[in-house]
Amino acid sequence: MPSLFERLKSGTERQHREIEALIDPLKNFRSLDAYKAHVLRSWRFYLPLEDCLAAFDWSAAGIDFVPRRKAHLIERDLRALNIHQPGLEEAQPLARQNLDFALGCMYVLEGATLGGRVISRHLATLGIGPENGGLFFHGYGAKTGEMWRTFQLSATGYCVTEDQIGEAVSGAKSTFERFSESMLA
């Protein structure tokens, strides 16, 4: 049986490519205004989703969820970039209310944090760094790789049955779809 992360990767390959095309920094972050629009869309996606994910007992999977939250980093970027934070629509609940599905959601968010390192390097060419509007893409800083590996170990140790892995893949697909919708809004 393929591992959890092999299944997550193969099961979301199409969605992953679509997201990469949507947020390609070389095409989409050519100006400060384009970057600001992306930061605002990211906040509209992350805050409600993280609020839904916060309801789960992550300790069952050996994960401390609180330090993995990113919406507060985006809020700091919004302030640094002088972007007004408009009201948000009420958070839509996850399609399925189980930790396996939520782990699939986290796979997308943690993978985005890992990929943020590439975007962070590009933002430097616009003069944007963690201190002036690029904190979100800075992720966990020097600990980003370590946090990804810790997440992989925890998720793999928790999602061991075929049903659990299937739920995680469904959660990841759902999250990619939500993210695509928010980037196109």
Model feature map: region roles:
Residues 1-185:
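Metal- and O2-centered redox machinery and metal/ROS homeostasis
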